[in-house]
């Protein structure tokens, strides 16, 4: 999302590499001649391992993709897919540089044999109409405003996990850990034992697998940490299978001394404001990135209880999270009006325990 020196400064990279016994080379990663020449030099070394540092610029070759945002802090084209318009502008700029005179113009479309319609989704967490990430950013801001013992830790995903407001307004309570979930979780455990309440932020697929051992160690020491796992579940699928968290619930459920909280909407998410203080356990906040079902009356939402979303007299569907809540409501409304009831339960592990 941002500059390397703001996430995990490299220091004197040459000294670090050569100090480990490696041969160090640098080259221009956008210059094929420079790359070819460097590789030729590297091949002459037969005794030591070789480290090549290729200097590159993200979005190089496309004028508007080489720039950061207006405040120079975040890179726009890291989080979310480019819009069709931006994509075509980038393609045509590259085509022109290659010496072609004609412009390309097409729209993205995918056709399935079963007739399912698929639309491209270029919305980011900050531009989606209603997003749990936006809501979480506001909740964090509210909590941090009144409590200096709270610390936000971020794995270079401030836009995708909602820590951007805390980073701007409460920088003394914000730690940018870079893409290093194991270190981040261990750091959080130490902060918790010193009397702080740390909020750890990353994608669910990375947080619960890479740092599973560190999470378990923290729990075994009764240190209270709020683990915030985003992009949970199969949808949205655009980031690919590596970013889809389908085992996180099972992994965290096997741990002791931890609550699981999976809100389905803004109203349920607001319960985190009280759960952070009421629970004496660590909390795993499981957040999906799909559009949300409609809000419910705050009077219908209470910690440790199911939330009724639709009345029904014959059957009941009980689920958690926004994705399944939307599907359950669609299924229930496809039947007779009062036949199927729909409930969401944001604290499912309490039931299993």
Predicted regions mapped to residue ranges:
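Glycine-rich ThDP/TPP pyrophosphate-binding loop and its adjacent helix/strand module
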Residues: 1-101, 258-353
